[in-house]
Swiss-Prot record:
UniProt protein name: Transposase InsD for insertion element IS2-9
GO annotation terms (biological process): DNA integration; DNA recombination; transposition
Presence of keyword Lyase: no
The Integrase catalytic domain, residue ranges: 112-295
PANTHER family on file: TRANSPOSASE INSC FOR INSERTION ELEMENT IS2A-RELATED
Gene3D superfamilies tied to this protein: Ribonuclease H-like superfamily/Ribonuclease H
One GO molecular-function entry: DNA binding
Keywords: DNA recombination, DNA-binding, Transposable element, Transposition
Species per Swiss-Prot/TrEMBL record: Escherichia coli (strain K12)
């Protein structure tokens, strides 16, 4: 029902004898709508009704997701609900509906503080369009409840974001650990074979990556070592983002009373990341879900992202 000030003014002017066309043109009001409104009877009522939806079931499913993954925002909650709906053969839930329900029930995460832009311009692109073109690697450490420190080295594919291999140790970041991760990544993607064309191995300038033994071993496996610019963490942004994700969504909430327990739970975290963690660059699919979808459809990575 029209209740705007312009419409009310137009009706008043027409009631005083002004022409409908002149009033609609001067006030920029739809003449057709004025024509309909003026011919309504006094007892006219708007028969339209807002759609009432029962959100109880969706709210229960949302609580189930955030009960297990409390650091997930509404987009990743929606992605997991969508995946479950696809498995059950049910209609997918709209992301805006998930946002509305979570907002009404105070389940949204707090907004992150604004990050000041970097003064150093970064014009390159770390992500690639096809799998097995570029892999990236980095490391991080975290502390257990008993004070024991674990150091993790990992490798990711810069297209499908799958964690190819990882290693955890109580020692430092060394060349032997990096070589183990390299070998595990190659075996993960190529089995007992070597890449038919060199795969870029993108890392920072840590001594374990720049060591001659590491670089020689990389070339033996069909990898081409590439190092980022000095003091440019954004040049290895995919690996840096993964560190933030694994610490925020997994390490911060998993039990880690000692190193052995933490290592076991970390293995489950990497498996959950590969199999279930929705990634925005993959259309909010998990890395392995994205790979399965691509293999099933027989499509390239670019076309797969459009589906």
């Amino acid at each position: 029902m029209w209740t705007g000030k312009k419409v009310d003014s137009a009706r008043a002017l027409i009631a005083r004898g002004w022409g409908v066309s002149l009033v609609s043109r001067c006030l920029r009001v739809s003449r057709a709508q004025l024509h309909v409104i003026l011919r309504r009877t006094d007892d006219w009522m708007d028969g339209r009704r807002s759609r009432h939806t029962d959100d109880t079931d969706v709210l229960l499913r949302i609580h189930h997701v955030i009960g297990e993954l409390p650091t997930y925002g509404y987009r990743r909650v929606w992605a997991l609900l969508r995946r479950q709906a696809e498995l059950d053969g049910m209609p997918a839930i709209n992301a805006k509906r998930v946002y509305r329900i979570m907002r009404q029930n105070a389940l949204l995460l707090e907004r992150k503080p604004a990050v000041p832009p970097s003064k150093r311009a970064h014009t390159g692109r770390v992500a690639v369009k096809e799998s097995n073109q570029r892999w990236c690697s980095d490391g991080f450490e975290f502390c257990c409840d008993n004070g024991e420190r674990l150091r993790v080295t990992f490798a990711l594919d810069c297209c499908d974001r799958e964690a190819l291999h990882w290693a955890v140790t109580t020692g430092g970041f060394n060349s032997e650990t990096v070589q183990d991760v390299m070998l595990g990544a190659v075996e993960r993607r190529f089995g007992n074979d070597l890449p038919s064309s060199p795969v870029e191995w993108l890392t920072d300038n840590g001594s374990c990556y720049r060591a001659n033994e590491t670089r020689q071993f990389a070339r033996m496996l069909g990898l081409e070592p590439k190092n980022t610019a000095v003091r440019s963490p954004e040049s290895n942004g995919i690996a840096e983002s993964f560190v933030k994700t694994i610490k925020r969504d997994y390490i911060s909430i998993m039990p880690k009373p000692d190193g052995l327990t933490a290592a076991k739970n970390l293995a489950e975290a990497f498996e959950h990341y590969n199999e279930w963690h929705p990634h925005s660059a993959l259309g909010y699919r998990s890395p392995r879900e994205y790979l399965r979808q691509r293999a099933c459809n027989g499509l390239s990575d670019n076309r797969c992202l459009e589906i």
